[in-house]
Amino acid sequence: MFKKGICSISDLRTLRGVAPNGHISCNLLRLAELENKDSIQAFEMIIRDLELSSGVCRTTYRGRLQDVDALVGPYLLGSFARQQGLEVHDWAASDGLVSSEWARGLFRMFPSCQFTASDLTLYLVEVCRGNGESYIFEPSGVPLQYVYPPFVVSFNRRDSPIFFANRLVRMRAEHGAKSLQRIVSQYRWSDFDDPTEYCVPPDRIRILPLVHPEAHSLHRETKHFRIVPHSVLSPLLEPVHVIRSMNIYHRRYFGDADIAKGAEAVFNSLLLGGMWILGRTVEERKPARNEVSILRKTQSGFQMMCRLNGGSELEESLRSWGLIDSEECLAHCRAIPED
């Protein structure tokens, strides 16, 4: 027995619901630039299920942080002048879709706002071989996927033993990926939409953008919206007014030492009086729920401003590290009740 993968848009129509998302070819990411319904659907299905070798999931989807955006808006209007050149950064923004949704609203509130969406990985690397095979790698050279229609093999997950043919294909793919890793890690691209293609006969090496077409469209439409690479463990070169970091400072991805390092990076990246929007989306609940804390930077740490659905689970840790002011229960701090 073998499990067929989704290798084309026609496969998406016929096999959807049969092949799990991990068996959707990352090659289809390239078709998103066509900006038609089927290609964007394929892009969103891949992104929603994409897990990198670090364990970080790219999971995101349209409207995911809509209630967070609605909550934050009035606080920003009450803290900053409408004509101020507000600098907003959205860290670990995945494909940038929810960033673009938030940015469009902020541009109406703050016409001079500069918005930067960032993520550590903005593209994957595709190696197309002359025999119809494709290997998908992270920019560092770590293999993610092997595609040889009708097979789509994920290197992060193993198929059930009953799919014997898939397991044989995986063994072959692991050998091929190992021989290509060093070559892939040698090449660099200037941006996520860099069209440069390297030829190492019989192979062609190019990138697959991980940026959603709607975010890319906004990036082309206005200089006020940027998409850049950035690590959530590193401070910015220049401090800004607002940083949002949703669904990244999580113990599934980082130990306490790195989470503390990330919190310090946020603190050092904010202007005095700047805001940090911290939280996660609890997908286990149906419907999903955002648990968020809004904090303001002071001279000595962060001051609590508002909580949504009980606030971030990291509040206690931040307090133990001395990053939340002891006088946090101020009159303007309020909690949005849980459902």
Question: Where do the PLM segments sit?
Answer:
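A short beta-strand submotif of the Rossmann-like class I SAM-dependent methyltransferase core
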Residues: 244-250
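A short glycine-rich, Lys/Arg-flanked "PGG" loop and its adjoining helix->strand segment in the class I
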Residues: 258-272
